[in-house]
Structures are given as structure tokens and as C-alpha cells.
Regions:
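Extended, non-globular alpha-helical segments
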Residues: 24, 105-142
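Local beta-strand N-terminus motif with an aromatic residue
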Residues: 83, 98, 113, 191, ...
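Glycine-rich cofactor phosphate-binding loops and adjacent beta1-alpha1 units
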Residues: 175, 189-227
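A structural motif shared across PLP-dependent enzymes of the aminotransferase-like
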Residues: 92-107
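Glycine-rich beta-strand-centered segment in the early N-terminal region that forms part
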Residues: 10-27, 41-93
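Mid-domain Rossmann-like dinucleotide-binding core that forms the NAD(H)/NADP(H) cofactor-binding site
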Residues: 125-198
Length: 227
């Protein structure tokens, strides 16, 4: 925080295929912390440094998840109108910590924007956008669907809660792992079985899953074997 500062910049003007969002809430994600502190895993350090900046972030304004209202639209915009409440993941374009952010209407490498669920506020929408984008990406890549078995590790967090719901929605059998205090929450999301972190031995030896979704990066990979 001590290296961050407030600064006045010009308000961006949306291009023909962009919407201008008045940011009402922005999330601070693990990715933001890694980018700001250059805390990048060793195997990804060189390509990520080249992409994001060698000695400091190439983008002066970081932040990759936001929620707000559409302030203006380009002439080719069809899905959104001024006043719409939206949430967005900015991708490598970053910029969510600004007061205004231009986003392309259609999903791209520079992020994606969507209408906010009507029953949540701006702060909650940033969580849905971040967790939802990550969970959706990996579950689609794993082709999770009817008849597949999924283990969600970290099922009560931002990504895990959405992963459980998406996997169930697509017809998978979901086994979830969470802390003791969140077991009922995770069960209410539709998990078929819920295991406690404190008693992971309850998972039967040799248990098989089509896909393991590790939302916290702490799963004991020595116990996992690709089959």
C-alpha cells in the first residue's frame, strides 16, 4: 500500500465496440498482490515479467475485477445500455482500481463484462465475477459434465463455491472439501459429499475423480495420481 498513490487522469472515451464503466467497487485479488509485488511463481516468472513489466507493473493502474454502472457506450454496442449495472474481469488490461474503465462488449483476451445479478450489490458482484470467471474457465477446459466426478478442494472460497454450483448444474457428482465451519454452506450449494479439512482421511484410499479442482493451491499432490 505504501507504494500506491492517488492521481488524477483523463476519463477514458469508449471506442465503437466498448462500454465505459463507472467503477463502484473493485476487488483486491491474489493476482493483484502477485503483480504489485512481482511475487510470480518461478516457472512463470520470465513470461509474466515480459508481459506485465520487468521491474514494475507496466500498467500504472492495476486491478482485474470490478463492478459498476455503464456510463457511456460505443455506437456498435448491442448488449448494454447506459445505466446498466455490470461486473467485469479486466484480464491483462488491468485498470480496475480507476474510477472509470473501458471494456470491450464481447469477451476477449482483455477481459469480459456481464450484467450483474439483480439480487446482489456491487461488492458481492466483484466476487462473483472473479470466482466465476476462474471456475468457469477450468471446468470448461476439463469438460466437466453429466456423469463426471469432481473433487473441489477449497469449496467454501470465492472460486470453490462457484465451482461446486457449476459442476452440479452440469450434472457432475461433486465431492467438496472445506473447513468445519463451512460444511453446511457447501452442502447447501449442492455438493453430493462434503469432507472436512481436519479429517481428510475420510476420503477413501484409492478414491477416483475425473477432475480435481484445487481452489487454494494446497492440495497434497503426492496423494493425487493421474489416471
Amino acid at each position: 500500500p505504501e507504494v500506491m498513490k492517488l492521481e488524477e487522469i483523463d476519463r477514458p472515451v469508449p471506442k465503437d465496440d466498448e462500454v465505459l464503466i463507472r467503477v463502484r467497487a473493485a476487488g483486491v485479488t491474489a493476482s493483484d498482490i502477485f503483480i504489485r509485488g512481482s511475487q510470480i511463481p518461478l516457472r512463470m516468472r520470465i513470461p509474466m515479467r515480459l508481459m506485465l513489466g520487468i521491474t514494475r507493473p507496466r500498467k500504472g493502474i492495476i486491478g482485474e475485477v470490478l463492478a459498476g454502472e455503464v456510463e457511456a457506450i460505443g455506437r456498435n454496442i448491442q448488449r448494454f445500455k447506459v445505466g446498466d449495472k455490470v461486473c467485469a474481469v479486466t484480464g491483462f488490461s488491468l485498470g480496475a482500481y480507476a474510477e472509470y474503465k473501458c471494456m470491450k462488449e464481447l469477451d476477449s483476451k482483455q477481459g469480459c463484462v456481464a450484467h450483474m445479478p439483480a439480487n446482489i450489490g456491487f461488492e458481492a458482484a466483484t466476487v462473483v465475477a472473479y470466482g466465476g470467471a476462474l471456475a468457469l474457465q477450468f471446468l470448461e477446459r476439463a469438460r466437466v459434465g453429466q456423469g463426471r466426478s469432481v473433487l473441489v478442494y477449497g469449496a467454501s472460497g470465492t472460486c470453490g463455491t462457484i465451482a461446486v454450483q457449476l459442476a452440479k448444474h452440469w450434472g457432475a457428482h461433486v465431492t467438496a472439501v472445506s473447513g468445519t465451519s463451512h460444511i453446511e454452506l457447501v452442502r447447501s450449494l449442492g455438493a453430493d459429499a462434503v469432507l472436512d479439512y481436519a479429517n481428510q482421511d475420510s476420503l477413501e484410499p484409492g478414491a477416483r475423480f475425473d477432475f480435481v479442482f484445487d481452489a487454494v493451491g494446497r492440495a497434497k499432490t503426492s496423494k493425487l495420481k493421474e489416471v
